[in-house]
């Protein structure tokens, strides 16, 4: 089975609404072993929608649409799908009864145009929608072609697909696709591509790198007659990739870097405090996202001015005068100072120039120093980021968390 995901709606075409439905459907279809060969977005125009159906069926046998099932004149999906398969629309009395009950239970007034949602071809397989007023449907045409019509709102579309479409589609496939995601930080997409380039041509399993935000994900996908067989195909490939990428792999699946670091801190009972300048508390804020971090996170200080660095952290006046606030020496004293004052095993410091102004030839915008004081031993790292203010701050925060992760993994 080959499928196309088609979003119908001018609001998506114009970018007013983000099409999250396509991502959900692509993942779910992959899990069923159904290949998605194309995704498209079509405006609310009869001629263009029919043309899109024509083009899609040149390469696939199944079209899954989202949107266009509402009560207004520009909701055209099911009418045009019926026209494409030469089916006649008729009032489905059972749907009208359900719709009237829905409005009564929710104390809403049912207008005449709402009845439009109860018209489907008599051949249509109806997909119930307990979360809204627009039922979905499956229309089966000749030559094993079908159009699956789903509502646009994700809270309606997702349960409808899971509860009704998945059992229907399962009858047409004898294999499954299973994916394993490895999350990588510390090397860019191009560098990782160099390290695993010979594996990218593999067919089963396939290996594909993707840049996502600041980190990179590596997806290993295998096809098998069942989940167990697919996972057995993935295992040796994963082992080889881990051997090549080492501790640049920080997690699997949907785990975030902050979750990995938070868990390490809590599991190892490593108390921590932060002193930040250009990041303005981003490291502290990100760590606090982890549930249970209160066991180990003691204090976070935003010491933006030189006076604050001296008063709160004990940075020496001579250090600031001789080396400046953005320096290895200042970052070192900041990390030591916050660890001492907060009485924590770890002190984190950040000082830098996020921009857009404030840079010099010697100390350009994007120059950042970070310090880690762990059990009295202090290390400092220098970063140079070529980016705008927000990206400099975000990249600093992520790199410091990754550095902390690697240091924590060395501690028994």
Curated annotation (Swiss-Prot):
The organism of origin for this protein: Clostridium perfringens (strain SM101 / Type A)
Question: What's the short name of a Pfam family annotated to this entry?
Answer: CinA
Gene3D superfamilies from the UniProt entry: 3.30.70.2860, CinA-like (3.90.950.20), MoaB/Mog-like domain (3.40.980.10)
Protein's recorded name: Putative competence-damage inducible protein
> What family is reported?
Belongs to the CinA family.
Among HAMAP family, the record links this protein to: CinA_B
